Amino acid sequence: MNKQNDMQLSEHFTLSEFTKSITAERLGIDNKPGYEQMLAMRRLCQEVLEPLRQHYGKPIRITSGYRCEALNRVVGGVGRSQHMLGEAADLSVPNEQVARDWFQWIVRNTNFDQLLFEHSSRLRNRWLHLSCKWDRKRNRHQAIYNYKVSNSPPSREGLGVGSCTAGTCKRQL
């Protein structure tokens, strides 16, 4: 592994966790981020992921982080995906209770842009998609708890519509 991939973005998260992709490896896609994307990933770690990890004291597995344009296209990501900017990550959640706990904690304690609890009932996959914009003032605090994605793998970004404010989401949970 080269030095760039070993780079710590925060105490518990490395660049390689954001860039590793079996699909990219299989297809020979170079999924290396640029400097701005690395800064955005660091911001996401500092603002949301690291505080979440510190609070629960357990490892968090990123299933999809940074995606170059070619990889995003292959996995069916949306054209303006925040994954391509280094602003988004999908997190594996072992069960719905953990998803609910993490979701509520993120809404109440972090400055995020978008938070979706996504799931595919046919494939029985569930994950949290979260993002944080580089410019903190532009974070929308869009949170949708029960966002169903039709038969999509956890590395695919949802195409959701609608939103609620952090306060509304807290009351809905």
What spans do the regions from the language model cover?
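Short connector loops at helix/strand junctions that flank enzyme active sites
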Residues: 55-57, 84-88
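Extended, low-complexity, intrinsically disordered C-terminal regulatory tails
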Residues: 46-76
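Glycine-biased, low-complexity coil/linker segments
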Residues: 156-158
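Catalytic cores and adjacent binding grooves of peptidoglycan-active enzymes
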Residues: 2, 80, 85, 93-152, ...
